[in-house]
């Protein structure tokens, strides 16, 4: 006797439709459209996990640059000064200091200026 795909198909469909939860209209309710949208969504998710790292680095650089200019130095000269002064702080930490601890950041800028 031939075995039908009933339970396997139902499980597969349920899995896709569960992933499509929150999508608009037929992309949530109809298996074929939901499957296409879920595949596309997974591609976007994969791509944007890489993009997120770039976006945060850009944001940190923008914040550091703004804080540097308040202390009369450009971002590139500041980074150069840090390298020459052997101060090993990454951009994430520097951006956090620039936003939350401007006095500490100003001291770091002075050390970077002195090393130039």
From Swiss-Prot:
GO terms for molecular function: rRNA binding; structural constituent of ribosome. Binds directly to 23S ribosomal RNA and is necessary for the in vitro assembly process of the 50S ribosomal subunit. It is not involved in the protein synthesizing functions of that subunit. GO terms for cellular component: ribonucleoprotein complex; ribosome. Gene3D superfamilies: 6.10.160.10, Ribosomal protein L20. The lineage of its organism: Bacteria, Pseudomonadati, Campylobacterota, Epsilonproteobacteria, Nautiliales. This is Large ribosomal subunit protein bL20. It comes from Nautilia profundicola (strain ATCC BAA-1463 / DSM 18972 / AmH). Belongs to the bacterial ribosomal protein bL20 family. Pfam families: Ribosomal_L20. Transmembrane segments: none annotated. SUPFAM superfamilies: Ribosomal protein L20 (SSF74731). NCBIfam families: rplT_bact. GO terms for biological process: ribosomal large subunit assembly; translation. The keyword Ribonucleoprotein applies. PANTHER family: 39S RIBOSOMAL PROTEIN L20 (PTHR10986). InterPro entries: Ribosomal_bL20, RIBOSOMAL_L20_CS, Ribosomal_protein_bL20_C. Keywords: Ribonucleoprotein, Ribosomal protein, RNA-binding, rRNA-binding.
